[in-house]
Amino acid sequence: MLNPGEPDVQGVLDVLASAIARHEGPWDTIDLRPLAADAPDFPALLNAFRKAGLAVQSYFCFGNWYLRVGGRSYAEYFEALPSQLKNTVTRKRKQLEKLKSRIVVCDSETGLEEALRAYEQIYAVSWKIPEPYPHFISSLCRTCAGQGWLRLGVVYVDEQPVAAQIWIVHAGIAAIYKLAYDERFAKLSAGSILTAHLMQRAIDIDKVHEVDYLTGDDAYKRDWMSDRRERWGIMAFNLRTPRGLLAAARHFGAGAAKRALGAVRRLFGGQT
């Protein structure tokens, strides 16, 4: 949240939380997520909100699997994978090579629109729920392509797109942002083949030091990654508004919310 070199993290957050608490505009809750709970500014933010008279609750968001490359080549990384995954990738890659298949990775504006159409076609027939903001992904990809950050991979079989993944590479980190495959071709394991292909590119060509699978504790992620960390959230409740007080009562129980309200009244001189 803050620059790690900030000399007075607690002081800065105290001022911020106090300004938020005293803001006259109507607000009920603040929900900050996802955050690194092991970062020094996480407990500092909790303390700042409490000192400002807000009811505060931290909560678990999700597990985050990631890979520490550690200077390895892709070959060294692949050799350390679970044997079942290695066998699947090796066997299915040979199977795909016997078919009329190809893998295309779009990393610039050239060919981007075709790659986006392929991704959207795959996504529409996958298990994924529809995007709430349909144009967001395409706009994000165009922005990333313009900056050289995009790695949009598509697997074609008989010129039909069957699997796609969106990776974003920046500052030495490859983030696996989106993936989907056509379930009618599930037996080909095209998604796994594409992951291996993009992983090789990220490690050997992009020279990343970390690959991040982002949100979720899906079982398959631990096979590809080396480490897991947690992301947490902080929710702060404005006890000076009816909705904020009601939300706090739902989260903490009516008794705890009532005690917190008493503390707020004392803090603000009896005004709520």
Each PLM stretch: what is its role?
Residues 7-9, 109-113, 242:
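A short acidic, often aromatic-flanked loop/helix-cap motif at beta-alpha or helix-coil junctions
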Residues 122, 180-182, 191-194, 240, ...:
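Short, charged/polar low-complexity linear motifs in solvent-exposed/disordered segments
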